[in-house]
Amino acid sequence: HYSSRRQRQMCIRDRKGGSSREKWMKNDKPVLPGRLNDLRHIIYKSADTQWRQAKNNMGLMLKEGLLKENIDGEALKWAFNKMNKRKEDRKILMVISDGAPVDDSTLSTNTSDYLETNLKKTVKWIESKSNIELLAIGIGHDVTRYYNRAVKITDVHDLGDAMINQL
C-alpha cells in the first residue's frame, strides 16, 4: 500500500535499477557495467537488539513486494564489514535466502552468472579468511551451492527452529 503516487513511482523505479541504471543510461550505456541497481540494506534485528524487541520486524521479511531485487554478494560484504567492527569473541552472520541472487537490471547488462559469481567469491572469502561464522538458511531453495554451512527448509514456519538449530 503506497500513500502517494510519488511513492508508487519511486518503488517501480527502484525495481528497475533506480538512479544507478539512470546514470548508466545517461553515460551511453557502457558495456558490462557491473552492478546496475541501487542498494537497500534492511536490518531486521541488530546485534544490540533483544529478540523480543525485534520479533515483529522479523515478520517483515515475508511482506509481499518489499524485496524484489537481491544483490546478495554486496549485501553480505556490507553486513560483514559492520559485524567485523564489533568486539564480541564469537560472531555469527546468518543469511536467510529465497534462492539465488537476482537483479534484472544487472543481469540484463552483464554475464548471466555475474551475481552468482560475486556471491560465491564473497562467501569463499568470508568462510576462509575471517573469524565470522557464516550460516545460511534457504527457504524453499537449496543454498548449499553458495554456503558451506547451509540448510533448506520448505515451510517458512520452520524458520525459527532452523535458526536455533544452525547456531
Tell where the protein language model's regions lie, with residue ranges.
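Single conserved hydrophobic/aromatic residue that forms the stacking wall/gate
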Residues: 1-14
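Short loop/turn segments at strand-loop or loop-helix junctions that form parts
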Residues: 13, 95-100
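Short, charged loop segments at secondary-structure junctions
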Residues: 17-74
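VWA/integrin I-like adhesion module and closely mimicked acidic/polar interface patches used
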Residues: 63-70, 74-81, 99-146, 153-154
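Surface-exposed acidic, glycine-flexible loop patches that form ligand/cofactor-binding
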Residues: 81-89
